[in-house]
Structures are given as structure tokens and as C-alpha cells.
From Swiss-Prot:
One of its GO terms (biological process) is translation. PROSITE patterns: RIBOSOMAL_S16. Residues 109-170 are annotated as: Disordered. It holds the Pfam family Ribosomal_S16. This is Small ribosomal subunit protein bS16. Residues 131-150 have a biased composition (Basic and acidic residues). One of its GO terms (cellular component) is cytoplasm.
Amino acid sequence: MAVKIKLARFGKIRNPQYRISVADARNRRDGRAIEVIGRYHPKEDPSIIEIDSERAQYWLGVGAQPTEPVLQLLKITGDWQKFKGLPGAEGTLKHKEPKPSKLDLFNAALAEAEGGPSTEATTPKKKKAPAKKDEQPTEKAAEPAAEKAAEPAAEAPAEAAAESEAPAAE
């Protein structure tokens, strides 16, 4: 049985995505595959090329013939050079740079805006000195009120004592 390593297309219109599959050469393009060994997304920047190198080496070793587009992908990943024993087995595959985290972006913007990283609140705090001045008059106002409350309390026991004496006299 003639076995080919070929691209099976899937994805939306004008957004092609491919599976790199091992299939019988007589099967149609998107037909039944023996094994899927990778994927290829040409519309990404840079293109996503993922090939299971171990499985590709196995299928090339048992005689599977890659189609021309798959051969180019195998050269980019370095699997073809490894199979043939040629120099350059590391390949020329480009990797996407990792995106910076949102926390790093926020800290950078904060440092740019204020001149240094700060974990404090972004709004300025109110000064406490005027608040202390306001507290002193309220304490003074509270003292006379306490004195006034103490006076009726002092009179109340005297009245209670006077009442207790009055019934005893009768």
C-alpha cells in the first residue's frame, strides 16, 4: 500500500487550517487518515507548524512519501534533514514571542505616569491635620454635655433617698 504524508484541509472559507496526516495515497484529500501527526495554520503570524517529530521519522522510515507542501514543512522543522542525515537538523522554524502579562503592562504604564512603581492608591489621601482640629471642638462640646448628664444623675439618687425617707415617716 502506498502511503503519503499530506495536508488535510479544514477551517473556514479564507481561513485555511491543515492537519498533517498520514493516509493511503488513493484516498481523497480530506479523507480517512491512518494517523494525524501535526497541524499547520498558515494565516497566523508567524505560521503555526507543529509536527510530532518522532512519528514523522517513523513514517518516513517505513517508506511514506511526503507531498511537496509537507516536504517544505518538514524542512522548516528540521525533520527532513534529520531523516536524510543532512546538516541543519535544528530547522528554521520561527516562534511567536510570548505576550507580556497584563500586570506587567499595568505596572509599566503606572511607572511611566508617576515616575516609579507604586502599589498605593491612585487618588491622593486627605490630610489628617485639619481633621484633628475638628475633633478638638467636638471633645470640648462633649465634656459640657457629660457634665449636664452627671448633674441630673447626682440629683436622682438624692430624690430617691428623699422618697425612701418619706414613706418611713408615715
